[in-house]
Curated annotation (Swiss-Prot):
It comes from Arabidopsis thaliana. Residues 190-224 form a coiled coil. The lineage of its organism: Eukaryota, Viridiplantae, Streptophyta, Embryophyta, Tracheophyta. This is Protein RKD4. It is found in: Nucleus. Residues 130-216 form the RWP-RK domain. GO terms for biological process: embryo development ending in seed dormancy. Keywords: Coiled coil, DNA-binding, Nucleus, Transcription, Transcription regulation. The keyword S-adenosyl-L-methionine does not apply. GO terms for cellular component: nucleus. Its main location: nucleus. GO terms for molecular function: DNA binding; DNA-binding transcription factor activity. The keyword Transport does not apply. Pfam families: RWP-RK. InterPro entries: RKD-like, RWP-RK_dom.
Length: 256
């Protein structure tokens, strides 16, 4: 029952809408067209209007253009352009104003210097001092090399050459060079060490005569470092070496 009622209402509404549209005048609806804006001035007319404008200098009141304290004007001009051409500007800089340049400025009445300048001077002076120090050291080494004599060098024959150079306060190369100049081509440390060991061993066995001969031979090597060991000294050294070897071996056998 309710569905038939709704359908009848829809039919009446559709009929009413169709009758309303038939009675409307189609010509009564206005077209919504946007109006076209037309420019009333042509481009050429704009240029003509600019030509008709009065000169610019006639629009300005020259009485209002008054100079300030830093400018000096000459008011003898015939047109607006002459006004600006005849302006004289005072570019004088006061003496109490100091311009900044690439180099630091130091005032004459200032009692203190720039920290940067002091630092730079300190670095330069340090470099100079280092150069002078190195040069002095080289000169001292050269003088030290020239002053080395045989009497001073032979006191260090009983120790290695590197240790001797350190105690003599010279370089190893300097000491070797000076030794060659004095005729010392081989450092006699090993020879003297061998002789001292041999003398000690012979003293322990009571061979006083051989000890005396070895001491004389040691003195000879201290005077002539390139002198060779005698055949008798070499034989004694070999005999002592064999005796020490047998003694150590026997001690080792007793231990095991």
């Amino acid at each position: 029952m309710s569905s038939s009622k709704h359908s009848s209402v829809f039919n009446y509404s559709a009929l009413f809408l169709s009758l309303f549209l038939q009675q409307m005048d189609q010509n009564s609806l206005h077209h919504l067209d946007s109006p076209k804006i037309e420019n009333e001035y042509e481009p050429d007319s704009l240029y003509d209007m600019l030509d008709k404008l009065p000169p610019l200098d006639s629009l300005l009141d020259m009485e209002d253009l008054k100079p300030n304290a830093g400018l000096h004007f000459q008011f003898h001009y015939n047109s607006f352009e002459d006004f600006f051409e005849n302006i004289e500007v005072d570019n004088t800089i006061p003496s109490d104003i100091h311009l900044l340049t690439q180099e630091p400025y130091f005032s004459s009445d200032s009692s203190s210097s720039s920290p940067l300048a002091i630092q730079n001077d300190g670095l330069i002076s340090n470099v100079k001092v280092e150069k002078v120090t190195v040069k002095k050291k080289r000169n001292l080494k050269k003088k030290r090399q020239d002053k080395l004599e045989m009497s001073e060098i032979k006191q260090f024959f009983d120790r290695p050459i590197m240790k001797a150079a350190k105690e003599l306060n010279v370089g190893l190369t300097v000491l070797k060079k000076r030794c060659r100049e004095l005729g010392i081509y081989r450092w006699p440390h090993r020879k003297l060490k061998s002789l001292n060991s041999l003398i000690k061993n012979l003293k322990n066995v009571g061979m006083e005569e051989e000890v005396k001969n070895l001491e004389e031979h040691r003195f000879l090597i201290e005077q002539e470092p390139d002198a060779e060991l005698s055949d008798g000294t070499k034989k004694l050294r070999q005999a002592c070496f064999k005796a020490n070897y047998k003694r150590r071996k026997s001690l080792g056998d007793d231990y095991y």
